[in-house]
Amino acid sequence: MSDRLTDDEIQAQLPAAWDRDGDEIVRTFEFESYLEGVGFASAAGGLAEEAFHHPEMTIGWREVEVRLTTHDAGGITQKDIDLAERFDELAE
């Protein structure tokens, strides 16, 4: 199990485009089309499966909201920060 990060650690490490929402970090990725968003969600799901760390993803019209938390730790851990960074790279 991963250890929860402190508030200071979260603030220092949170990727720029992500926000904190309680015990989760969240980002809405925007795309040119609905299908581009679906493709991103599928690829992000593959990365999540590789990391064995599964986010909540909501697919909307030309956007995908991603929420990350570590349930067994009861909050935000390094796993969340690391996966957020991988999703950012995927979206570039």
Swiss-Prot record:
Transmembrane segments: none
GO BP terms in the entry: tetrahydrobiopterin biosynthetic process
Keywords: Lyase
GO molecular function: 4-alpha-hydroxytetrahydrobiopterin dehydratase activity
Enzyme Commission number: 4.2.1.96
Swiss-Prot/TrEMBL catalytic activity: (4aS,6R)-4a-hydroxy-L-erythro-5,6,7,8-tetrahydrobiopterin = (6R)-L-erythro-6,7-dihydrobiopterin + H2O
Pfam families named in the record: Pterin_4a
Keyword Lyase among UniProt keywords: yes
InterPro entries: PCD_sf, Pterin_deHydtase
UniProt keyword Lyase present: yes
NCBIfam families from the UniProt entry: PRK00823.1-2
HAMAP family: Pterin_4_alpha
Family indicated by similarity: Belongs to the pterin-4-alpha-carbinolamine dehydratase family.
Protein name from the UniProt record: Putative pterin-4-alpha-carbinolamine dehydratase
Organism: Natronomonas pharaonis (strain ATCC 35678 / DSM 2160 / CIP 103997 / JCM 8858 / NBRC 14720 / NCIMB 2260 / Gabara)
